[in-house]
């Protein structure tokens, strides 16, 4: 793309930011050895009905693929209200917040999904936050997603897998331009 930093880039936040994060996680984590296989996946067709995530979740079930957890990064880069995010999640124009992360998941307090959220938050607080130059605030949300909305973690949950969604506190809307 030959646009400079001032060009409009619809889609960069939903979900270009999530794709960039998945690629960077794969790059960094490829240097280590793990006891289990980690799949770094991006899917298409979320706005058209979770097409890609439904397809892979259904495939995983029919092929008996053991998935321990699904961590969905959807809309994770919007930090400036009015540029990369818009109401209702923004408290005001030009408000900047790169330190708040919301964790959405299905079920009650003891569900596998909420337990996964609590585990991630605890591990972050004990292992990562003390080393972070700018600490993050992780907030476990009570709902599976925003009202009337859905993301790519839902088809995995519907197929019996523990699944959560990470998202920025300042979330995008239809007025985003960056």
Model-found features: residue ranges?
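Extracytoplasmic/cell-surface-exposed regions of Actinobacterial cell-envelope-associated
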Residues: 11, 32-34, 135-143, 170
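Metal-dependent peptidase/peptidase-like ectodomains
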Residues: 43-154, 159, 163
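Catalytic-core environment of secreted peptidases
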Residues: 1-41
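Acidic side chains
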Residues: 1-4, 13-15, 72-74, 152, ...
